[in-house]
Amino acid sequence: MRDMADRAQGRLLLYQITAPMLDLAIGMGLEIIKYGEEAVVDLSAFTLDTPRLRSVRKAERAVARKGAEFRIVPAAAVPVIMDELARVSDEWVRAKRHEEKGFSLGRFDRDYLRHFDIALVLIDGRIVAFANLWLTADRSEASVDLMRQVDAAPPGTMDFLFVHLLQWAQARGYRRFTLGIAPLSGIEGRRLAPAWAKAAALVFRHGERFYGFRGLRAYKEKYAPEWEPRYIAGPHGLGMLKALRDLSRLVGRPMVEASSPHLALPARPARGDGGADRPPTPPPAANNAAAAETAGVAA
């Protein structure tokens, strides 16, 4: 990988890697920094009948009383509802007053979404929220990528969607459901910690107004997940800062030209027929969207 990066005149950055990958990254001479924590729900033990999920249970029932319905549309039928999905997405983008992101954050793309089963929330026959599904072929894991809802959706609509998705995946034998990353979560800025750790901990504690990181973690915490650390591995010193800058540009500028010498955009996976393999680590797209109700975080 380092040779490939050198030949492309780029900087190697391993993004959102798991703990088992750390030995490999260290052996490659890369610097390791903690990026955040991923929320994972063990579906074998998932139940709404627990005090920890009381707020989720209450929100789901409130939306159900408004006539909400949950439905899964198979990938083959998604083109039929694509215009409706676009309407929901456009309304969501306008309400959030920001542009679409990209790379590891989901963005509305018709050619991409048509490859995936789509979960819907409908009220009076009209789509008020949706998410595309990432499902492993061996049913070891399920997750979502892009999540959108209309501005007039009842409070708790995303909870309604998540509850039914968890139950749907559980009933089909999936072992775990990934709620995505909480960036900067679990990083301790102790006195002897590296400067990056101190800065990350400071942003997590005091940057809620601008970034919503604490609200994002709090939203996911409602589902009583296990938190698994995720890391970034890259060049030492100034090279790491430059690589992180490149990463930020990839996420914030999804339509960057492919001719850029350092920012070659990989294609998002083209398969997703309900049983297709998904990338090894899900990006935080849905993660951010799911927290939109409580934290105002963009996806």
Regions found by a protein language model. Name each.
Residues R7:
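Globin-like tetrapyrrole-binding proteins
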Residues G10, Y15-I32, E38, S44-K58, ...:
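A conserved beta-strand-loop-helix scaffold within acyl/acetyltransferase catalytic domains
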Residues G272-G275, G296:
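Residue-identity detector for glycine
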Residues A201-F210:
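A short acidic, glycine-rich active-site loop
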Residues P283-A299:
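Long, low-complexity, intrinsically disordered segments
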